[in-house]
Amino acid sequence: AEIYQATGVPYHTESQHSCGFARLCGLNNARGKYHINIDSDTLYPPYYVETMVKALEKPGVVAVSSLWSYIPDKDHSWLNLKLYEFARDVHLYLQSFKRPELSVRGLVFAYRTDYARKVGIRTDIRRGEDGSLALGLKKYGKIAFVRKRKARAVTGYGTISADGSLLNSFKVRAIHALKGVGGIFSKKEVYKDEDDNLINP
């Protein structure tokens, strides 16, 4: 907050802690036609906003999502990360045709403000609020995906570190993807909430 105050940048404080409440606070205070998520732990390329807006301005498009990379470190080599990202990107691409809501990630998500307000952002779940929003936005138009480097963000390891090593993280996600491979070829309009994902079950 001190940095925003010193630079004169408008900001809003959300006292309720969760990604859903933070996203909803931003949406409720948005004043533009398009709402572009920007995460504080993520680096974005110079023309990220322009690239996302250009995609949003195409006829019939109500939301767009792009891809992201990780910075190599002593525990994650450049080659292993590239292989991991390639496999993940291919899966997200194939999945995006029939079930784009499963390929959306909040750190690289942008959408029409008016439609998003009609759908709303869920605050009763621990994860998946962005995908849930995308699911609701589908009835208003297309969820597009930007594959350009100009829209590729760089972020921390977050959830992939939760499963231990990069290899183990890949195994966990590969098994999950294989179990749901049939979903790549069919649309889905309703998803059942898992009990462990509900904040107040």
Task: Show which residues each predicted segment covers.
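Conserved nucleotide-sugar donor-binding
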Residues: 31-32, 105-119
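Short, flexible, basic/aromatic active-site loop/helix in glycosyltransferases
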Residues: 66-72, 80-102
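Acidic donor-binding loop at a coil-to-helix junction in glycosyltransferase catalytic cores
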Residues: 126-133
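Active-site donor/metal-binding and catalytic loop motifs
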Residues: 147-164
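Conserved donor NDP-sugar-binding/catalytic core segment of glycosyltransferases
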Residues: 47-78
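Glycine-rich, basic loop-to-helix element that forms the pyrophosphate-binding segment
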Residues: 3, 14-30
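Acidic helix N-cap motif at the loop->helix transition within catalytic regions
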Residues: 1-6, 47
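Short aromatic/hydrophobic "clamp" motif used to bind/position activated sugar donors
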Residues: 35
